[in-house]
UniProtKB/Swiss-Prot annotation:
Residues 191-423 form the Protein kinase domain. This is Atypical kinase COQ8B, mitochondrial. Coiled coil: none annotated. Keywords: ATP-binding, Cell membrane, Cytoplasm, Disease variant, Kinase, Membrane, Mitochondrion, Nucleotide-binding, Transferase, Transmembrane, Transmembrane helix. Homodimer; homodimerizes via its transmembrane region. Interacts with COQ6 and COQ7. Interacts with the multi-subunit COQ enzyme complex, composed of at least COQ3, COQ4, COQ5, COQ6, COQ7 and COQ9. It comes from the Eukaryota. One of its GO terms (biological process) is cerebellar Purkinje cell layer morphogenesis. The lineage of its organism: Eukaryota, Metazoa, Chordata, Craniata, Vertebrata.
Length: 544
């Protein structure tokens, strides 16, 4: 768990790292309270103080500062049209070719450095030449292979791109950062084949137009701008062929190649975390399930003045094609230039949403990529995207988890240890070294909720402090953590990371204490949980 959390506390862009579409529209005249609840859940936090409420003057300045025109969506300059290898054999051939190429690259690099005048690159360079395996030539081989095969392998690469460079080697982090920014897109004939297989030969009757070149290309699919016959602008996500059938082999092939470099820390992908990752990837390949998740979130946040969820276009919804309203705004990593008050407000809303997802809805979108959160300055709203990794949490888990967070917020180390055992995070038979490291990790991550007054996310060294504990946590763990925590901690770490990136000051303790009291009040009697969602093997329920 803390291995994943410690590595995630670093900048990330996300799989759709481009501006998308048009402004969402203003909320209308008059004063507004910018809260994710629009009701009693956290109403008192919108009144005053850093990270709480904005006055009319703040909102006026934000609207005056908005761009005159929302930028048109566009692909990365590095993206190119390239056929997706759809069969397992063709995908394996790409990984085999990569392994051979990397080996030859190592020999060439070692030969070059053994010649007179050959030496490791200085500190001022790119840093890639400091490892023969991760030379510039080999880096290019890895980038090209992952951008060609796409799918689960590229998804893992994008996940590793957000690791702290003290967590994996800086050279490898640099490679995966390039991977994140330059996914390729499939050629027209391959895209049309998927559309015909999913929507039928008459698919064009469902739309007035569909741009042939996508405006975003990600690990699992690419997104095209379209227009319905009623004039509604839509984003149509089309899945690459063969991706869903190659998840397990892709992950194993990529990790086998990377282990050649010894660049990944031992234990980074334990068996249990690999199983959880593969399950999440299978969910993300089921666009019908994603449509149901998006509809669920749209209903849960229907009255929310700050967050919006685009509507699903059900006539463009199949297992490998998903149509939704075209959304507008810029990813969170492009919001650093906003005023401190606006950055505080955005991050306050993100943290509030995380707490609501876990402890009110018990249903969370677990992908923390910044491109899944588009901020529109014209309306002071954030649009939520990409619901493929959404999942539910049972009350037994949340009952224990909220007590672990409460113990950390209260600074009670003994209680953290006991509640972690109640959560089945620990067995009770761990070594003292492991127990101490676990408690310390919980206390570090609980600091925002333990701090009186606004917590300065921009001043911490959370990633480095967690990193120092990882060797002990890997060496002495007796049992895998609860399955729910893999995705949950990735999302929470991503939210903390966004707050750090935007240098937010937020009164987190008051926010959590209110959440805690409302959670237990809602459990007497039991509050209804979010509706059941289709999982692998379940029948599809129309999201409408």
């Amino acid at each position: 768990m803390w291995l994943k959390v410690g590595g995630l506390l670093r900048g990330t862009g996300g799989q759709l790292g481009q501006t998308v579409g048009w402004p969402c529209g203003a909320l209308g005249p008059g004063p507004h309270r910018w809260g994710p609840c629009g009701g009693s859940w956290a109403q008192k936090f919108y009144q005053d103080g850093p990270g709480r409420g904005l006055g009319e003057e703040d909102i006026r300045r934000a609207r005056e500062a908005r761009p005159r025109k929302t930028p048109r969506p566009q692909l990365s300059d590095r993206s190119r049209e390239r056929k997706v290898p759809a069969s397992r054999i063709s995908r394996l051939a790409n990984f085999g070719g990569l392994a051979v190429g990397l080996g030859l690259g190592v020999l060439a690099e070692m030969a070059k450095k053994s010649m007179p005048g050959g030496r490791l690159q200085s500190e001022g360079g790119s840093g890639l030449d400091s490892s023969p395996f991760l030379s510039e030539a080999n880096a290019e081989r890895i980038v090209q292979t992952l951008c060609t095969v796409r799918g689960a392998a590229l998804k893992v690469g994008q996940m590793l791109s957000i690791q702290d460079n003290s967590f994996i080697s800086p050279q490898l982090q640099h490679i995966f950062e390039r991977v994140r920014q330059s996914a390729d897109f499939m050629p027209r004939w391959q895209m049309l084949r998927v559309l015909e297989e999913e929507l039928g030969r008459d698919w064009q009757a469902k739309v007035a137009s569909l741009e042939e070149v996508p405006f975003a290309a990600a690990s699992i699919g690419q997104v095209h701008q379209g227009l319905l016959r009623d004039g509604t602008e839509v984003a149509v996500k089309i899945q690459y062929p063969g991706i869903a059938q190659s998840i397990q082999s892709d992950v194993q092939n990529l990790l086998a190649v990377l282990k050649m470099s010894a660049a990944l820390p031992a234990g980074l992908f334990a068996e249990q975390s690999l199983q959880a990752l593969q399950q999440e990837l299978a969910w993300e390949c089921d666009y019908r399930r994603e449509a149901a998740c998006a509809q669920n979130f749209r209903q849960l946040l229907a009255n929310d003045p700050f967050f919006r969820v685009p509507a699903v276009v059900k006539e463009l919804c199949t297992t490998r094609v998903l149509g939704m309203e075209l959304a507008g705004g810029v990813p969170l990593d492009q919001c650093q230039g906003l005023s401190q008050d606006l950055r505080n407000q955005i991050c306050f809303q993100l943290l509030t949403l995380c707490l609501r997802e876990l402890f009110e809805f018990r249903f969370m979108q677990t992908d923390p990529n910044w491109a899944n959160f588009l901020y529109d300055a014209s309306s002071h709203q954030v649009t939520l995207l990409d619901f493929g990794a959404s999942r539910e949490f049972g009350t037994e888990f949340t009952d224990h988890y909220i007590e672990v967070v409460k113990a950390a917020a209260d600074g009670d180390r003994d209680c953290v240890l006991q509640k972690s055992r109640d959560l089945k995070f620990l067995t009770g038979f761990e070594t003292k070294a492991f127990s101490d490291a676990h408690v310390e990790a919980v206390m570090i991550l609980g600091e925002p909720f333990a701090t009186q007054g606004p917590y300065d996310f921009g001043s911490g060294e959370t990633a480095r402090r967690i990193q120092d504990l990882i060797p002990v946590l890997l060496r002495h763990r007796l049992c895998p953590p609860p399955e729910e925590t893999y995705a949950l901690h990735r999302k929470l770490a991503g939210a903390f990371l966004a707050c750090a990136h935007l240098r937010a000051h937020i009164a987190c303790r008051d926010l959590f204490q209110d959440t805690y009291h409302r959670y237990w009040a809602s459990r007497q009697p039991d509050a209804a949980t979010a509706g059941s969602l289709p999982t692998k093997g379940d029948s599809w329920v129309d999201p409408s």
